[in-house]
Structures are given as structure tokens and as C-alpha cells.
């Protein structure tokens, strides 16, 4: 399997990726998009240069769109993952007093 832990390791595979490998690659892509967003936001917060802020704001928005597209692709290919993420969101709302217990009990 090709490695997706570094951009330098990504290469054309000799064979098609397995479904598990595709999911792993998509999850790596999602993480990479969020990492890029964080880097660009840190640069914007560290400069007064309006040209830099303008361009990086646009790039950051693009990265958010990419992350959203990859998340939707993950949802399509692995609905079980989506169910777990949604459960985590409902659990957080419950812990914050903003929603019912996702486990259906009173504790």
C-alpha cells in the first residue's frame, strides 16, 4: 500500500487501493486540509499585511471547501464512520446541557 503519512511518500501505486486504503487516504486528506487551514490562519494572525490576509483568507476558504467535500465523500463511502461522528456531536451537546442523552438513558 502507498504510504500517506507524508506528501513525499505519495506515489502512483502498482495496483488499485483497497477500500480500506482509500478510506485511510481520504482521512489523511481531511487532516491535511485542516492542518493547512490552521497554518494559514496563524500566518494571517501574525501579520498586518492586508495583501497576505486577503489571499490567505481566500485560500483558507478553499481549504474549508476541500475539507467539506472530503468529509462528504467519507460519509458516502463509510456511513458507519459518519454515525460515530454524529454520536460524538450529540454526546458533546448533552455534556454541555444543550441536548438529550445520545445513549437514551438518564445518566
Name every feature range the model reports, one short phrase each:
Residues 1-107:
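Iron-associated oxidoreductase/ferritin-like identity signal
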Amino acid at each position: 500500500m502507498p504510504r500517506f503519512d507524508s506528501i513525499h511518500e505519495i506515489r502512483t501505486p502498482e495496483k488499485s487501493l483497497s477500500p480500506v486504503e482509500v478510506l485511510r487516504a481520504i482521512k489523511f486528506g481531511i487532516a491535511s486540509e485542516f492542518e493547512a487551514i490552521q497554518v494559514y490562519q496563524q500566518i494571517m494572525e501574525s501579520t498586518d499585511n492586508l495583501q497576505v490576509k486577503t489571499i490567505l483568507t481566500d485560500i483558507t476558504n478553499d481549504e474549508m471547501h476541500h475539507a467539506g467535500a472530503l468529509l462528504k465523500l467519507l460519509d458516502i463511502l463509510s456511513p458507519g464512520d459518519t454515525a460515530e461522528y454524529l454520536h460524538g456531536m450529540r454526546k458533546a451537546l448533552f455534556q454541555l446541557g444543550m441536548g438529550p442523552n445520545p445513549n437514551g438513558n438518564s445518566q
